[in-house]
């Protein structure tokens, strides 16, 4: 139970989905499981509506699912600060609000992006004293006990039984535009059994349309070629997307939010990190693969798949090698999911930390 009940979370939306996806899950969990009063300040309400369907982006102040949501712009009233302020992903706080934080003596935490890189453990919870007298703490989510953990609600179901293999293959596809979709679909159409690909609507639809030789595609469209069957879904709510991940045999995910949810689904997944200059994203990918699959006998098969997918080309031999090992991959990921679930979750660790500093 938290002694500090009044929290503000600041969210600046960068890629429309990842930042607000993480912030919305965290805000809801802090309120529901820790009985906190949460205000979520968002710079782009229209983009946020994709993740929060009942959000009215024309209203500057509103309540959705018992979370207070405020439009963050130059007109926002920042005269009062919360007891705890979460600056997500180094989004930067308004000077007027920082002054209010000094008066309130707010606890200030910068929630960083998730990473499996080894240096994260060394910098997690490090203080950074500021000239205004406040201390800014860096909080790093991660995969080990020495980090801030992963977002995981109590409502996530965990089972001791894996799904049995089926003749048909169900795949969810959520990726950035750089992904080699043409290469993937070329391999899938020649699969020995039927492959059903479910695509939540996003910026990759033109590439899918190009593969099938049509001008454009839209939500509800169903396209087939040989053994490949593609169904375009609407952009799903977080609950519906989580259910899709659990229902599929293989999930292609991207960024941060869908990546973590793929792990909790306990199914084989291929992750595409957010692209960064100087191949920083490749370093993050390699760090995750080295940590998560360290004890996996088929590590190279999985690592090869991730690297091909992220680098934008996928040789034909990759697909058959991956599918041949799909069952053993599923078994390993299922075990990893259950191991990670033994650690404290991010929200719980964050509440403890903020009440301690």
Q: What is the predicted role of each segment?
A:
Residues 8, 12, 16-17, 24-28, ...:
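A donor-sugar binding/catalytic signature common to diverse glycosyltransferases
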Residues 70, 226-235:
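Active-site donor-binding acidic/aromatic loop of nucleotide-activated sugar
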Residues 112-183:
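A nucleotide-sugar donor-handling region in carbohydrate enzymes
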Residues 11-35, 39-133, 202:
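Active-site and donor-binding regions of nucleotide-sugar-utilizing enzymes
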Residues 154-219:
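Conserved catalytic-core segment of nucleotide-activated headgroup transferases in glycan assembly
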Residues 325, 340-357:
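C-terminal alpha-helical cap of glycosyltransferases
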Residues 254-333:
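Catalytic binding pocket for nucleotide-activated donors in carbohydrate/polymer assembly enzymes
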Residues 2-8:
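Extreme N-terminal starter segment of soluble prokaryotic enzymes
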């Amino acid at each position: 139970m938290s002694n500090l009940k009044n929290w503000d979370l600041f969210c600046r939306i960068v890629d429309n989905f990842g930042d607000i996806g993480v912030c919305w899950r965290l805000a809801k969990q802090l309120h529901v499981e820790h009985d906190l009063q949460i205000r979520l300040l968002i710079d782009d309400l229209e983009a946020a509506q994709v993740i929060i369907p009942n959000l009215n982006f024309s209203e500057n102040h509103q309540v959705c699912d018992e979370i207070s949501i405020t439009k963050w712009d130059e007109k926002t009233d920042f005269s009062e600060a919360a007891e705890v302020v979460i600056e997500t992903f180094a989004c930067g706080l308004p000077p007027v609000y920082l002054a209010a934080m000094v008066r309130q003596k707010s606890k200030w935490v910068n929630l960083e992006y998730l990473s499996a890189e080894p240096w994260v453990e060394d910098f997690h919870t490090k203080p950074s004293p500021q000239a205004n007298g406040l201390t800014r703490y860096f909080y790093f989510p991660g995969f080990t006990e020495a980090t801030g953990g992963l977002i995981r609600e109590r409502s996530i179901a965990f089972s001791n039984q894996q799904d049995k293999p089926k003749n048909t293959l169900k795949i969810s596809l959520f990726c950035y535009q750089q992904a080699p979709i043409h290469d993937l679909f070329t391999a899938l159409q020649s699969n020995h059994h039927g492959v059903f690909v479910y695509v939540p609507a996003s910026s990759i639809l033109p590439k899918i349309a190009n593969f099938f030789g049509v001008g454009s595609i839209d939500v509800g469209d169903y396209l087939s070629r040989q053994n490949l069957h593609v169904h375009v879904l609407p952009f799903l709510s977080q609950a519906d997307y989580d259910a899709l991940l659990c229902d599929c045999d293989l999930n292609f995910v991207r960024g941060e939010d869908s990546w973590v949810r793929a792990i909790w689904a306990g199914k084989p997944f291929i992750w595409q990190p957010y692209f960064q200059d100087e191949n920083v994203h490749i370093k993050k990918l390699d760090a995750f693969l080295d940590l998560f699959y360290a004890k996996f006998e088929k590590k190279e098969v999985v690592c090869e798949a991730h690297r091909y997918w992220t680098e934008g080309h996928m040789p034909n031999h990759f697909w058959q090698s991956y599918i041949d090992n799909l069952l053993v991959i599923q078994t390993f990921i299922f075990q990893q999911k259950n191991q990670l679930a033994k650690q404290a979750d991010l929200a719980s660790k964050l509440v403890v930390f903020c009440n301690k500093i």
